[in-house]
């Protein structure tokens, strides 16, 4: 309490004058104890006040603790309090002095202490409010004074004074609407309890007020602001620390939007005339260019600001790393010296931008003119450069930044650079039209090209001017002048420019410097973004290539050949298409349809090998294409992976991309589907897989989303078929090939591989792409299955976030889509899509089980889940949601998923339920998934699936079969992989194995072990870990599971044990933790056995990913049981019996046993495929990478 109280008090203290005075008054009125307490609190508050973060936390604590304490306290000291209150009511002044103490006990306790519950708080609050209001702005001094006066005034009539004070406050801040509200509140405040509570809140409000000068924020009830705004507040605080008050930061976006356009326009007009005035034609051109650039920049900045608000952008910034942040600081902070040093911190740069924006705007106008005069900075400098101009040395750099800007500005969001760049140009063009549309566009291009050309081609007047600003004499000289010019510029902009000519010598130096700086900067950026930026910008091909290449390796085996051809079209198809939004799309699209269909055949035929490969290829390609987009997992992976291992820089950028992509692109989504597929192959490659993780979350997200997108698009259907085929074959085969070891590798390897493909691999499914899969889907399932599985894996990984949906259906959830999709769904589910839209979901989705799609719809999601629905929703929602394997979970996931996204949902099927188990049936099963009886089997043949239920997972199989039952549980969320990062694989890999029990490792589950698919752990799939963390929450990234990752839970939810099932059950944890999952579970999974999914851990672990892979879904291979999903033994997925068979080997992963059923997961088949290894997880790239990504993501969210 004391800390909270202190924090609260700190808030008051912040209001200092009032607080202090109040404290004094309190001391007098309240008495020694009250005064001492008030002083102590004030001191604490002051200390806290110094630390923004601490203050924020303190405020929260204070609010909760104050209310609680005050309430509990109230009874304790009603006498003193009531008496004080009464007195305060009776005597306004006395109330003020005395009230503080009483207030303390009744409401806030220590916090409130200073104020009386009624009168005390009222006046005090008013004062505080006044101080708050006053504090934010210049009025602040006045306000505090007014409050000071007010205390005296108030005393005369307790009630009237408060109202009058309220009115006064209003008058003081007529613009503030809240004050009006406050008066009404004040009467309640008088009531002590409400007052104190509100009072506590008030300090919070005050914070917001400080945040935004806009009194509005302060005025608004802080309760909402505290929660909702709080993030902003925190960021604001950060900015405040940097330099300007929070106010500036908050205001900038809005003001920027409003102000910047006008000033810019004005500038443009003014600049144009000045340009004409400019004696040198070059100068004129320069000016025009500068204006254009500036507008562009402004637009970009605005976009950035908006985006910045969004996590995606933040992620991009993070991914871009120093490049972007450095950029912003120089540019954003006009002043910047301080900021410049901080280029590293995005937040700061943003904050500084905000604060500087106002300055910049002022300087901008002048600066812009000066800029115009300065050709130099012109474009690159843009208004910001004006400030930068002050640093002549920096200027080159800033220009470089700017230059990248168009390409890079996008830097902030690589993906955005892709999609946005075109958009920005359009926007810029629109804005610039008056100034010079054509020119602006040219400049843009130029800028993009410029990095190389400009340096090489100083000859080009325009570029040069833009770049080096040779025309501008010394860039430093002129720029400095610019600052001087700011004021003078308006008067004589032209005149000044000539003098700068002296700077020409400087210009030469500057040019060199600029070149160097630009080269360095570009190198830096390029390193990060080379592949990213150039490829994306340039063409898909390049990107594709690499991925492709990687893919090949991955596919290695069969795939490679196929992959080449297919790849580009297929994965690309969607991913690119969507993703690229631009270049890729065109090529992509056509291919898409064709591809889809074509792929299908190839896929089908080769199904396995080829399929994979093509998929992979495409995936990769997509990914690269997408790259920017992220596209899908693959991409992501690629990217991610790349970064991880390969390119690293590119990778990074890719990762960024991924992140951004998702947001940025829809395309991304497409990729997603691909993703899956991609992934898979990679899986085989192993390396691929990893990458996925790397991107991991980011990727995932996109991926899924992508999928959806694609789904949505034509692709959906198309995809389906293609995907379908692909998936099955691909995934499986791939998997198979890779098979176990791949898996492992994947997880583990992956890393090493890094290969871009890596990521893709994950994809797993690619399929997904197929989502389509579904189409096939179901059948696929089996086949798909594999694919799916793969997909799943991939997905998982990838998408993870997204959804996964294993089964999703989820998508279906989207069901609707679903259906179709549903198929699509496929494992992979887009879910995200789904999330996305529904439809997409579809795609994504994956649906394990599809069929059901409908179910899907059902909820799809669910693995079977019925839940689905929820899940579905979730799924969709979630988008991510993996939904549990079991879908459902989905749901739950959903929600969480959502967040988490995870949804996974494996199942779909809806059926619900997921049933469990995988096995569904199992109901009884429990056993197994596979239903033990075979049936269930994953695939169960469907047979039986008995439960059939559908889901058939594959039919049959249903993943989960029926049963579902519920377990659903939504929890699901867990998601496959729980995010955890691990995602499927959770990093850790280790883990667990799907089944692993181990949990340990988690395998699936990420990290933490947790997860274990199977684990018995219960955790099960998820578990454990899940629990581990779970929580789904996660957000996580996780990928797979995201979220929570943990939880994964594959399954789910339910926990219940039941569930088992795939999971499920888990439920429980799912979400949360629970974890459970257990894939398999055996029932119950939870523990059930064990085994669960996979029992045996095998480490394999499903997940493992990371590491090892393991996971393999089925992994098979290994047979060794190990894995297998079912691992053998272990029980196998399918439980035992069969199981163990299951796959036992069968490699299979079999989900289901294969053997048994052949179906079995592996099995056979299809799913099985054996080899396949499914790898669900894939991996993730490294946990470290994933964690980093997650951390980034989370930060952005926090922001």
Swiss-Prot record:
Residue(s) carrying Phosphoserine: 83, 244, 319, 322, 325, 345, 355, 367, 370, 408-409, 412-413, 416-417
Ranges annotated as biased composition (Polar residues): 379-397, 461-477, 619-631, 1099-1120
Compositionally biased region (Low complexity): 365-376, 404-419, 533-547, 557-574, 581-598, 715-734, 1064-1098
Keyword Transferase: no
Keyword Amino-acid biosynthesis: no
Alphabetized Pfam families for the sequence: POM121 (PF15229)
Residue numbers spanned by region Cisternal side: 1-56
Keywords: Endoplasmic reticulum, Membrane, mRNA transport, Nuclear pore complex, Nucleus, Phosphoprotein, Protein transport, Repeat, Translocation, Transmembrane, Transmembrane helix, Transport
UniProt site (Cleavage): 531-532
Alphabetical list of InterPro entries matching this protein: Nucleoporin (IPR026054)
Entry comment, domain topic: Contains F-X-F-G repeats.
Purpose of the protein: Essential component of the nuclear pore complex (NPC). The repeat-containing domain may be involved in anchoring components of the pore complex to the pore membrane. When overexpressed in cells induces the formation of cytoplasmic annulate lamellae (AL).
Family: Belongs to the POM121 family.
Protein name (database record): Nuclear envelope pore membrane protein POM 121
Organism: Rattus norvegicus
């Amino acid at each position: 309490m004391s800390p909270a109280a202190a924090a609260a008090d700190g808030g008051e203290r912040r209001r200092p004058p009032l607080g202090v005075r109040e404290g004094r008054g309190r001391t007098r009125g309240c008495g020694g104890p009250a005064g001492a307490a008030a002083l102590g609190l004030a001191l604490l508050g002051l200390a806290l006040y110094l630390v923004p973060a601490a203050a924020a936390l303190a405020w929260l604590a204070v609010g909760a603790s104050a209310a609680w304490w005050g309430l509990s306290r109230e009874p304790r000291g009603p006498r003193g309090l009531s008496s004080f209150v009464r007195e305060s009511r009776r005597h306004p002044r006395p109330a003020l002095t005395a009230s503080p103490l009483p207030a303390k006990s009744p409401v806030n306790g220590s916090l409130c202490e200073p104020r009386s519950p009624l009168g005390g708080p009222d006046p005090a609050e008013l004062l505080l409010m006044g101080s708050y209001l006053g504090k934010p702005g210049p009025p602040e001094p006045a306000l505090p004074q007014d409050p000071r006066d007010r205390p005296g005034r108030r005393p005369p009539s307790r009630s009237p004074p408060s109202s009058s004070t309220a009115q006064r406050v209003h008058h003081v801040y007529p613009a503030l609407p809240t004050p009006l509200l406050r008066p009404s509140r004040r009467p309640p405040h008088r009531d002590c309890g409400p007052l104190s509570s509100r009072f506590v809140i008030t300090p919070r409000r005050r914070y917001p007020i400080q945040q935004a000068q806009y009194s509005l924020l302060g005025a608004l009830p802080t309760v909402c602001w505290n929660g909702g705004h709080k993030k902003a507040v925190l960021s604001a605080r950060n900015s405040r620390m940097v330099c300007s008050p929070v106010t500036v930061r908050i205001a900038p976006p809005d003001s920027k939007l409003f102000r910047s356009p006008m000033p810019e326009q004005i500038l443009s007009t003014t600049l144009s005339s000045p340009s004409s005035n400019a004696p040198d034609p070059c100068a004129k051109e320069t000016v025009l260019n500068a204006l254009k650039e500036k507008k562009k920049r402004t637009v970009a900045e605005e976009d950035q600001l908006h985006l910045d608000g969004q996590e995606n952008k933040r992620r991009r910034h993070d991914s871009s790393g120093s490049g972007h942040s450095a950029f912003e600081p120089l540019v954003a902070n006009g002043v910047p010296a301080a900021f410049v040093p901080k280029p590293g911190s995005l937040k700061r740069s943003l904050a500084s931008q905000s604060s500087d924006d106002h300055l910049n705007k002022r300087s901008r106008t002048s600066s812009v003119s000066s800029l115009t005069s300065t050709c130099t900075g012109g474009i690159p400098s843009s208004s910001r450069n004006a400030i930068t101009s002050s640093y002549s040395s920096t200027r080159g750099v800033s220009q470089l930044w700017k230059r990248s800007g168009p390409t890079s500005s996008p830097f902030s969001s690589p993906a955005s650079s892709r999609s946005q760049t075109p958009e920005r140009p359009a926007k810029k063009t629109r804005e610039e039209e008056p100034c010079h549309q054509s020119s602006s566009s040219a400049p843009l291009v130029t800028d993009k090209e410029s990095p190389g050309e400009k340096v090489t081609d100083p000859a080009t007047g325009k570029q040069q001017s833009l770049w080096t600003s040779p025309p501008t004499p010394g860039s430093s000289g002129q720029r400095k002048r610019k600052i001087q010019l700011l004021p003078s510029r308006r008067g004589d902009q032209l005149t000044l420019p000539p003098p700068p000519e002296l700077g020409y010598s400087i210009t030469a130096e500057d040019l060199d410097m600029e070149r160097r700086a630009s080269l360095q900067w570009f190198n830096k950026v390029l390193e990060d973004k080379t592949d990213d930026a150039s490829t994306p910008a340039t063409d898909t091909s390049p990107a594709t290539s690499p991925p492709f290449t990687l893919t090949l390796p991955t596919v290695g085996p069969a795939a490679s050949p196929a992959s080449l051809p297919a790849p580009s079209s297929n994965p690309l198809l969607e991913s690119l298409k969507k993703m690229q939004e631009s270049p890729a799309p065109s090529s992509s699209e056509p291919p898409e349809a064709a591809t889809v269909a074509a792929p299908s055949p190839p896929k089908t035929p080769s199904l396995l090998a080829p399929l994979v490969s093509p998929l992979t290829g495409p995936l990769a390609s997509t990914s690269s294409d997408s790259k920017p987009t992220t596209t899908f997992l693959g991409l992501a992976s690629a990217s991610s992976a790349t970064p991880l291992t390969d390119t690293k820089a590119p990778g990074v950028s890719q990762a960024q991309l991924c992140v951004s992509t998702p947001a940025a692109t829809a395309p991304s989504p497409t990729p997603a589907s691909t993703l899956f597929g991609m992934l898979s192959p990679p899986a085989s490659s192993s390396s691929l897989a990893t990458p996925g993780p790397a991107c991991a979350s980011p990727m995932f997200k996109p991926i899924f989303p992508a999928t959806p997108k694609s789904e949505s698009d034509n692709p959906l259907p198309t995809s389906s078929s293609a995907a379908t085929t692909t998936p099955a074959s691909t995934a499986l085969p791939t998997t198979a090939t890779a098979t176990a070891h791949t898996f492992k590798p994947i997880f583990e390897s992956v890393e090493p591989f890094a290969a871009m493909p890596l990521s893709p691999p994950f994809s797993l499914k690619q399929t997904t792409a197929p989502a389509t899969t579904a189409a096939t889907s179901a059948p696929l399932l089996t086949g798909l299955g594999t694919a799916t599985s793969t997909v799943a894996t991939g997905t998982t990984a990838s998408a993870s976030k997204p959804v996964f949906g294993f089964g999703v259906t989820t998508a279906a959830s989207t069901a609707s889509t679903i259906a179709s999709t549903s198929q699509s769904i496929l494992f992979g589910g887009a879910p995200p899509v789904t999330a996305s839209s529904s439809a997409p979901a579809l795609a994504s989705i994956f649906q394990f089980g599809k069929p059901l799609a409908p179910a899907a719809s059902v909820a799809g999601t669910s693995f079977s889940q019925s839940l689905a629905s929820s899940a579905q929703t979730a799924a969709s929602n979630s988008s991510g949601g993996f939904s549990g394997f079991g879908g459902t979970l989905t749901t739950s996931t959903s929600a969480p998923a959502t967040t988490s996204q995870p949804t996974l949902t494996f199942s779909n099927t809806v059926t619900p339920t997921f049933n469990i188990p995988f096995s569904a049936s199992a109901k009884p099963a429990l056993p197994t998934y596979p239903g033990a009886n075979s049936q269930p089997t994953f695939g169960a043949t469907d047979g039986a699936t008995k439960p059939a239920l559908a889901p058939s997972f594959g039919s049959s199989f249903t993943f989960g079969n029926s049963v579902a039952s519920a377990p659903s549980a939504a929890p699901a969320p867990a998601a496959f992989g729980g995010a955890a990062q691990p995602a499927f694989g959770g990093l850790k890999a280790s883990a667990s194995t799907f089944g692993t029990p181990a949990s340990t490792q988690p395998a699936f589950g990420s990290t933490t072990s947790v997860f274990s698919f199977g684990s018995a752990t219960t955790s099960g799939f998820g578990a454990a870990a899940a629990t581990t963390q779970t929580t789904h929450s996660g957000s996580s990234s996780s990928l797979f599971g995201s979220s929570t990752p943990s939880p994964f839970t594959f399954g789910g939810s339910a926990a219940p044990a039941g569930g088992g099932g795939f999971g499920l059950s888990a439920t429980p944890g799912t979400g949360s933790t629970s974890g459970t999952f257990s894939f398999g579970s055996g029932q119950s999974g939870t523990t059930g056995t064990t085994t669960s999914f996979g029992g045996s851990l095998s480490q394999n672990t499903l997940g493992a990913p990371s590491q090892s892979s393991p996971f393999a879904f089925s992994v098979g291979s290994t047979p060794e049981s190990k894995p297998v999903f079912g691992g053998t033994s272990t029980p196998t997925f399918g439980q035992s019996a069969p199981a163990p068979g299951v796959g036992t080997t069968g490699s299979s992963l079999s989900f289901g046993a294969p053997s048994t059923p052949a179906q079995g997961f592996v099995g056979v088949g299809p799913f099985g495929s054996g080899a396949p290894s499914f790898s669900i997880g894939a991996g993730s790239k490294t946990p470290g990478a994933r964690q980093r990504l997650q951390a980034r993501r989370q930060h952005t969210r926090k922001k």
